[in-house]
C-alpha cells in the first residue's frame, strides 16, 4: 500500500504513511487482521487486471500461466497481496515498497509459497534512475493517495511502462460521499481500517489523474467504478465512481 524508500530519489514519498504501514506490516497475510478489507477487495481487482491484460496482450485466458514471458512491476506492493497472484499467472514480477518491514513480510510469505518474486525496498524514482525496466505491466493500486506528490509519482510510473504495455491505477475519489463512507465510515464507525489510514484531501478525482499525464505519451481509460455490497460482503465492478475507482493507462 505504500511506495518504497531508501537513500535514493524519493521525493514523492510520504514518510508518515510509510511509518503507518510499517507498524502493521506483520498483519498483511491475516485475512481477519488490519488488512482484512484488502483481502475482501482483492478478487475484484485481480479479475479486472486479468481481464484487461488478457485483452491488451491477446493472451489465452484458459492457459495455466497466460502471461508467461511478460514483466510486471508492483509499486507499493505492501505484503504482496497482488504480487503473488500475478506471479502465479505467469508474470515475472518485480515488487517494491517504501517499508523494509513490508518487503520482509512479503518475501518471507512468497518463499513459503515457493514463488520467485523480485522484492526490494526501492522507490519508483530509484528504479527509473537505475534504468530498470521498462515493464509490460505496472501496478499502482491504492498507492497514489498515500504519496506526497501524486503528479510526479504517476509520471514516474508511466515512464517505467514499456510501449505496448498497460498500467493500472486504483484510488479513491475526492467526493463528499467518499469522505462520509471511505473515511469517516470505514475508519471511525465500522473500524474496517485503522483511524488515520487515509487523508480525504489526498483522494483524487479522475480528471486530476488525466491532467497529471497530459504531457506524457500515454492514453488513459476509465474511470471504472467498484463498489462494496454489504449484503454479500463482496466487491464488484460498478457504474458508481464516487468512492473507489480504477483507471488504465496504455502506451503505444
Curated annotation (Swiss-Prot):
PANTHER family: METHYLTRANSFERASE, UBIQUINONE BIOSYNTHESIS O-METHYLTRANSFERASE, MITOCHONDRIAL
Role description: O-methyltransferase that catalyzes the 2 O-methylation steps in the ubiquinone biosynthetic pathway.
InterPro entries listed in its UniProt record: SAM-dependent_MTases_sf (IPR029063), UbiG_MeTrfase (IPR010233)
Record's catalysed reaction(s): a 3-demethylubiquinol + S-adenosyl-L-methionine = a ubiquinol + S-adenosyl-L-homocysteine + H(+); a 3-(all-trans-polyprenyl)benzene-1,2-diol + S-adenosyl-L-methionine = a 2-methoxy-6-(all-trans-polyprenyl)phenol + S-adenosyl-L-homocysteine + H(+)
Name of this protein: Ubiquinone biosynthesis O-methyltransferase
EC numbers on record: 2.1.1.222, 2.1.1.64
Gene Ontology MF terms: 2-polyprenyl-6-hydroxyphenol methylase activity; 3-demethylubiquinol 3-O-methyltransferase activity; polyprenyldihydroxybenzoate methyltransferase activity
Family, as annotated: Belongs to the methyltransferase superfamily. UbiG/COQ3 family.
Top enzyme class: transferase
Superkingdom of origin organism: Bacteria
Binding site for S-adenosyl-L-methionine: 45, 76, 97, 141
Gene field: ubiG
NCBIfam families: UbiG
GO BP: any one term: methylation
Pfam families on file: Methyltransf_23
Keyword entries, A-Z: Methyltransferase, S-adenosyl-L-methionine, Transferase, Ubiquinone biosynthesis
Pathway field: Cofactor biosynthesis; ubiquinone biosynthesis
Amino acid at each position: 500500500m505504500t511506495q518504497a524508500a531508501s537513500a535514493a530519489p524519493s521525493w514523492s514519498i510520504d514518510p508518515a504513511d510509510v511509518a503507518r504501514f510499517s507498524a502493521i506490516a506483520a498483519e498483511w497475510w491475516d485475512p481477519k487482521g488490519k488488512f482484512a478489507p484488502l483481502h475482501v477487495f482483492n478478487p475484484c481487482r485481480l479479475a479486472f487486471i486479468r481481464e484487461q491484460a488478457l485483452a491488451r496482450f491477446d493472451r489465452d485466458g484458459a492457459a495455466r500461466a497466460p502471461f508467461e514471458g511478460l514483466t510486471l512491476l508492483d509499486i507499493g506492493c505492501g505484503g504482496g497481496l497482488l504480487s503473488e497472484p500475478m506471479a502465479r499467472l505467469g508474470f515475472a514480477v518485480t515488487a517494491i515498497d517504501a517499508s523494509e518491514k513490508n518487503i520482509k513480510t512479503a518475501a518471507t510469505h512468497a518463499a513459503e509459497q515457493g514463488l520467485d518474486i523480485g522484492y526490494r525496498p526501492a522507490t519508483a524514482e530509484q528504479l527509473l534512475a537505475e534504468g530498470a525496466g521498462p515493464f509490460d505491466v505496472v501496478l499502482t493500486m491504492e498507492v497514489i493517495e498515500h504519496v506526497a506528490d501524486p503528479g510526479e509519482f504517476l509520471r514516474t510510473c508511466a515512464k517505467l511502462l514499456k510501449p505496448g504495455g498497460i498500467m493500472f491505477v486504483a484510488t479513491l475519489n475526492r467526493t463528499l460521499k467518499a469522505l462520509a463512507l471511505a473515511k469517516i465510515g470505514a475508519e471511525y464507525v465500522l473500524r474496517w481500517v485503522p483511524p488515520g489510514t487515509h487523508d480525504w484531501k489526498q483522494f483524487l478525482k479522475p480528471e486530476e489523474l488525466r491532467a497529471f499525464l497530459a504531457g506524457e505519451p500515454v492514453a488513459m481509460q476509465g474511470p471504472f467504478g467498484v463498489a462494496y455490497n454489504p449484503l454479500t460482503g463482496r466487491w464488484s465492478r460498478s457504474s458508481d465512481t464516487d468512492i473507489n475507482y480504477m483507471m488504465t493507462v496504455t502506451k503505444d
